[in-house]
Curated annotation (Swiss-Prot):
Keyword field: ATP-binding, DNA-binding, Metal-binding, Nucleotide-binding, Repressor, Transcription, Transcription regulation, Zinc, Zinc-finger
Presence of the UniProt keyword Mitochondrion in the record: no
Protein name: Transcriptional repressor NrdR
Needed cofactors: Zn(2+)
UniProt function note: Negatively regulates transcription of bacterial ribonucleotide reductase nrd genes and operons by binding to NrdR-boxes.
Family of this protein: Belongs to the NrdR family.
InterPro entries: ATP-cone_dom, NrdR-like_N, RNR_NrdR-like
Limits of the ATP-cone domain: 49-139
Zn-finger segments (unnamed): 3-34
Amino acid sequence: MYCPFCSAQDTKVIDSRLVADGVQIRRRRECLSCTERFTTFETAELVMPRLVKTDGTRQPFDEAKLRAGMLRALEKRPVSMEDLEAAISRICHRLRATGERELPARELGEFVMEELQQLDDVAYVRFASVYRSFQDISEFSAEVDRLKKAGGKPGDKLGEPKES
């Protein structure tokens, strides 16, 4: 690695530590020429799979687009940004874990719906209504009924009165 101070090529690693929950390595280095010290961070370059849409077109995975879609579903809902970011991280991990170079976009949609259902039922129904193209109120009602029957998750459930 080149020294950022004198551009010499020879440096030595003095210290290495895992940071960012083990997904990054922080290295403390020293230049063998000028003896200046500097820090570098090392992360694995992970390639996300391309998404194959229903019309057959392919597009690269876009985390910003994922975040925007989830934020739209979660608008004015009591879900923290930390919980949203954790859900996005889990979705990205699941996409990488498939090991595939290409995935159907509907698979990403299913991952998103699973995460939203854990975060907030209202956000889940909002997303599902667009994702599954609900045509009328009966489809909304059927999805809400299915959620009520599933139950078991603490937090904001559909159909339950709000506490004041």
